[in-house]
């Protein structure tokens, strides 16, 4: 079938029932696939490309599009120099048209420069403040996001069909952010992240986290 179709990997065999009374052929194997193969996007003008996108679709590769309405959270992982910042810049450029953004940039690097160019506020370290103060500032912002979630839940209780604008919390180097920080502040930080990840889906509040690794220890 390759390259006309791309088979989607499954964890185990996928059986389907067939419309027949013959017990020998009442079942069949189902192979999910999509037409074509995914190829890298080549974008000559990012601003023009993002403005031409329809609805809440985010192209990841050719023949591979993600609907942001169906996304809970996004994680970008990779070693240094693997292109995490490049990918993040692309996603930010797409998301700015469909979502409100809260950007946290511990390295005061690429996301901060992008935010400045697009006139979006960014939380970054300051010379006269400790790392614990910096994470405390982030916790305040996350608490406000959690308040928004609870407020939106109340609106949904009265009107289940109410549509909210997406709100995306972007945190670069999320694991390195908590190293060397007061334990109470660190625990509060991860607790807020967990609550937002758990409750944010129905209220269209998302996390976009970037780190060198994500595993069961993190």
Where are these regions (language model features)?
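P-loop NTPase catalytic phosphate-binding loop
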Residues: 27-154, 167-168, 175-218
